[in-house]
Swiss-Prot record:
InterPro entries on file: BrxB/BrxA
Name the record gives this protein: Bacilliredoxin ABC2448
Top-rank lineage group of the source organism: Bacteria
One GO BP: cell redox homeostasis
Family, similarity comment: Belongs to the bacilliredoxin family.
Length: 142
């Protein structure tokens, strides 16, 4: 069992590293979420997870978005199942949407504008997720 825990810790850390190296700011507490998501401007939130579709589809799409011509003001991430209070607080901002991970939420002035939910990620190609994210930021971040 201890070996499994070590393995999972490595998986979690690698998933965190993927997002930090892509240029996203980790929000690990409810207070950090509150401080950032209530700011004026646009924020892309990536709800990270350890599932296969997060690693194979969502995180690569998230990384791509840092290079897209239209940019939100902030790129942040919370980690479902790991930073539970931060994730729960972030989800309170996602009114009208159920809990979903991995997922992306785009907020403007603290208000949810749109989401790309797990069902729009799982089983899709990364480029399809990128296109949904591009459409969202083109609509709300220009």
């Amino acid at each position: 069992m201890q070996q499994f825990n070590f393995f999972m810790n490595d998986v979690v850390q690698e998933a965190r590293n993927d997002m930090v190296h892509a240029g996203y700011t980790e929000l690990k507490t409810a207070e950090e979420v509150e401080e950032v998501l209530t700011q004026k401007g646009t924020t892309l939130v990536m709800v990270n997870s350890v599932c296969g579709c997060a690693g194979g589809i969502a995180r690569p799409a998230a990384a791509y978005m840092k290079n897209y011509e239209t940019q939100p003001d902030r790129f942040v991430t919370v980690f479902a199942g790991q930073d539970k209070e931060a994730t729960a607080r972030a989800r309170e901002f996602f009114t009208g949407y159920g809990p979903s991970s991995p997922s992306f939420a785009l907020l403007k002035d603290g208000q949810i504008q749109t989401m790309v939910e797990r069902h729009e990620i799982e089983g899709h190609e990364p480029i399809e997720v990128v296109q949904k994210l591009e459409q969202a930021v083109d609509t709300y971040c220009k």
